[in-house]
Amino acid sequence: GDSELVRIYYGTLRLGINLHEATPGWIKAEKDSVVVRLPPVKLLDNDFIDEARTTSFFESGTWTGQDRDVLYQRACRTMLHRCLTPQNVSIAEQNARDQFRKLMLSIGYEKVSIQFEKTDRRGNKK
């Protein structure tokens, strides 16, 4: 007979910067000016699916762990495709820019320049 398995996956993808990946000299200050060169925005955690909230919506037949893993991997790819958009990366960059600008102004710098390292389409630094 026909076997069916429908699972609902929940997750939170967090986009941001990892300062551990900043290159040497990423922040340069001179008098009242500072230039901050941030690492590229990326997905901060690959374990974004909340397994505890995953539910089987409809299940009939017998399913192996491998079958469930295939569905899990498909859910991961779908979430990544929907969330890692140029628009969301741009929003995350703007948030990082705003936070660093506020921080540098509060420290006392008057002129603040925030830049991001460039990456290729796969997210590797150029």
Locate the predicted segments by residue:
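Domain-level marker for long, solvent-exposed, non-transmembrane regions
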Residues: 1-126
